[in-house]
């Protein structure tokens, strides 16, 4: 099943199917940016996919789809791969990274911070969302990895597109790189989930990421250079939503019919720019 949607300046193509069958049909080097989050093999209850493979099976499957992505990624393209483990099995993301090393260069390691507690003026400020862990051995898991993979590690980025203002404004005139009061955000990205009332109604997927995370990755690569983007594990369309509102053409591939239908519904609901899409 294939849906072709127009949202403002973007053409969003959503395909229901197996990415290992769809990716070989794409021209070589035809994708500028890939943003995705595959199943982590943590035993999550997806509607269709079996998330309980042996480690060997899972890594071999990872090898197959990452090589397929490498073929379609443009020479100066960026591949942002969100991957996570669990406290009792922390090696999973590192083993996935080693598989990716067969086809890509790791250019940047980004830490997606979902929740954080910081000391501010002698008070503790806790913001974001986390799932409490009932354990005396493990800490609550508040961070996931986003691996920025490229062919040769030489892709130039639009770092100030996601830059932040200087807290000390004297730096604006002190540093030549200060520009229009912006400096590099760095590789720790605080992107919390939006508050929802009902998982089944508002976010009917067991392992989605916020559209804002995908938007930030695409803006870092450079919106002007992102002619076509890809998410081979589209889920309920987080990357598609980001692309719709950034005005970037996108192809999303999703195995499950229910998640695919929800992605189509969500993209059709895009009518105006959101905060995460603003330059």
What are these regions (language model features)?
Residues 1-9, 264-278:
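Short, conserved SAM-binding/catalytic segment
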Residues 2-262:
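Core catalytic lobe of class I
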Residues 159-163, 274-279:
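Short, flexible loop/turn segments with low-complexity composition
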């Amino acid at each position: 099943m294939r849906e072709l949607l127009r949202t403002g300046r973007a053409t969003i193509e959503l395909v229901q199917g197996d990415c290992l069958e769809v990716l070989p049909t794409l021209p070589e080097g035809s994708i500028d940016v890939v943003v995705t989050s595959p199943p982590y093999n943590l035993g999550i209850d997806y509607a269709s996919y079996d998330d309980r493979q042996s480690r060997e099976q899972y890594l071999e499957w990872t090898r197959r789809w990452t090589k397929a992505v490498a073929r379609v990624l443009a020479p100066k393209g960026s591949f942002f791969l969100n991957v996570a483990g669990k406290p009792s099995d922390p090696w999973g993301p590192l083993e996935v990274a080693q598989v990716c090393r067969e086809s890509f260069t790791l250019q940047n390691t980004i830490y997606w911070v979902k929740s954080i507690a910081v000391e501010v003026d002698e008070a503790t400020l806790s913001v974001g969302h986390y799932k409490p862990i009932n354990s005396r051995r493990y800490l609550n898991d508040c961070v996931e990895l986003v691996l920025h993979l490229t062919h040769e590690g030489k892709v130039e980025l639009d770092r100030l597109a996601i830059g932040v203002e200087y807290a000390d404004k004297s730096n604006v005139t002190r540093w030549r790189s200060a520009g229009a009061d912006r400096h590099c955000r760095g590789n720790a990205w605080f992107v919390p989930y939006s508050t929802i009332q009902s998982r089944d109604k508002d976010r009917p997927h067991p392992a989605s990421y916020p559209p804002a995370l995908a938007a930030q990755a695409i803006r870092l690569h450079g919106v002007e250079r992102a002619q076509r983007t890809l998410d081979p594990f589209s889920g309920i369309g987080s990357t598609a939503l980001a692309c719709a509102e950034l005005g970037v053409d996108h192809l999303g591939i999703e195995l499950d019919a229910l998640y695919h239908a929800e992605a189509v519904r969500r993209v059709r609901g895009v009518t105006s720019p959101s905060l995460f899409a603003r330059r």
